[in-house]
Amino acid sequence: MASSSLQSLFSLFCLALFSLPLIVSSIGINYGQVANNLPPPKNVIPLLKSVGATKVKLYDADPQALRAFAGSGFELTVALGNEYLAQMSDPIKAQGWVKENVQAYLPNTKIVAIVVGNEVLTSNQSALTAALFPAMQSIHGALVDCGLNKQIFVTTAHSLAILDVSYPPSATSFRRDLLGSLTPILDFHVKTGSPILINAYPFFAYEENPKHVSLDFVLFQPNQGFTDPGSNFHYDNMLFAQVDAVYHALDAVGISYKKVPIVVSETGWPSNGDPQEVGATCDNARKYNGNLIKMMMSKKMRTPIRPECDLTIFVFALFNENMKPGPTSERNYGLFNPDGTPVYSLGIKTSSTHSSGSGSSNSTGGSSSGGGGNTGGSSSGGGIYQPVTGNPSPDYMSISSAGGKGRFVECVLFFFLLCIIKLRL
C-alpha cells in the first residue's frame, strides 16, 4: 500500500517537474502612442509575440488598447499621466477612475499594475510633487474598495536622477532634497508590497562621456567589466550596475526598504539621433535591445546585490513615435516602424515557450502589423560611469546564470515533503 502511494506521489512529482518550464520569458515592452501613423491596437499582439513579450506597459488607460488585449494573456500595466495627479488626490475621483478604466475591463484584460505619474520627483514642479503621494494613496484606496488591491499594485516611475551619484553602486544614496517626498512613497511600497519603478538608460551615460565609458559595457557585449571597490561585486554591463545603485540607495535609507523590489520600467537605445547624440545608431540599438532580450529569454536577469530576485524589465519602446518632442533620438527608440516592419533585426527566435499564447516559432523582428499608445518618454538621465576595468568574476557569472535551477530544487523538496507526510499518515 505504501509502495503504491509512493509511486503515485512520484508520478505527481514527475508531472509537476516537467510541466514547470526551467526557462520562462518575462519580457516587458513599453507601448506608446505619441504618433499619428500607428496601426490600431488590435494589430499589435503579433508584434509583441514576435519578440517574446509577456508584459505590456501603457502610458494611459486607452480603452481601445484595453479591449484589444482582452483574452490575449498579456499582463498589462496602465498609467495615470502627471496631468491627472492633482485631481486623483480626491478619493472619490480616484474611485471613479479605477472603476471606469480598470475594473470595467477585468477579468478579460489582465491588468496587474497602475503607474501613477512618471519621473515626478525630478520634474522640478513642486505642485506636482506634492500631489504624487496622495494620488497613489487614493488610487490604492480605490482598489481596496473594489477588492482589487491583491491583484493590482500601485507604484510610480523615477529617473536615475533621484540618486546623488551612481558610480560606484556601493557609494550611492538618494538625493537629500528628495527624501522628504520619497520616504513616504518607499513606506507605501513596504506596506503594499509594490515595487519601485526605475527608468534606466545606459545610453545617456555613454552619450555624455563616450571617451571614458566602454561601449561594449553598455551594450551587453563581451568586456572586462569592473569590480565595485566598496562591495567587491563585479559588473559586466551598466544596466545591472545602475539597478544595484538603486538597491544600495534603498539599503542606505533603512533596513525596512531592503526587500522593496525594483522593476526597470524603461530602458532602450535609439536607432537614430542628432549629430551630437553620440552612439545613437541602428547598430548600437540592435546590439543593446537584442542582447538584452536574449538575456531575458535565458533568465540571466539577476544582479549581484539581489541574486535571489528575477529582474523585470520593460524595453522602450514598441514603435518609433513621430510626434514626440525633443531631439531626434526621442522619435527613434522603437523596435518597429509604424507599418510593422522591424527597424533592425534583433537576431532572436521565439516559440510558444517565450510568447503569450503563440503556437509557432517566429524569427524577429516582426512581420505583421503595429499598434498605438499615448505618452511615454526616455527623458531619464543615466549616471556617469568612470572607465571600466577589471576581470570578470566567475562567482558573479554563476549567479547571473542560475535561472531555472531553483524550480528543480523546489520540486525535489516538495516531493520528499509529500513522501514524509504520507509515511507518517
Curated annotation (Swiss-Prot):
Residues 1-26 form the signal peptide. Residues 367-384 have a biased composition (Gly residues). Its EC number is 3.2.1.39. Residues 402-425 form a propeptide. Residues 350-366 have a biased composition (Low complexity). Highly expressed in flowers and siliques. One of its GO terms (cellular component) is plasmodesma. Glycans are attached at residues 124, 362. It catalyses: Hydrolysis of (1->3)-beta-D-glucosidic linkages in (1->3)-beta-D-glucans. It is a lipid-anchor; GPI-anchor. A lipid is attached at residue 401 (GPI-anchor amidated serine). Gene3D superfamilies: Glycosidases. PROSITE patterns: GLYCOSYL_HYDROL_F17. Keywords: Cell junction, Cell membrane, Cell wall biogenesis/degradation, Glycoprotein, Glycosidase, GPI-anchor, Hydrolase, Lipoprotein, Membrane, Plant defense, Signal. It is an enzyme of class 3 (hydrolase). Residues 347-387 are annotated as: Disordered. Induction: By infection with the cucumber mosaic virus (CMV). InterPro entries: Glyco_hydro_17 (IPR000490), Glyco_hydro_17_plant (IPR044965), Glycoside_hydrolase_SF (IPR017853). Belongs to the glycosyl hydrolase 17 family. This is Glucan endo-1,3-beta-glucosidase 10. It comes from Arabidopsis thaliana (Mouse-ear cress).
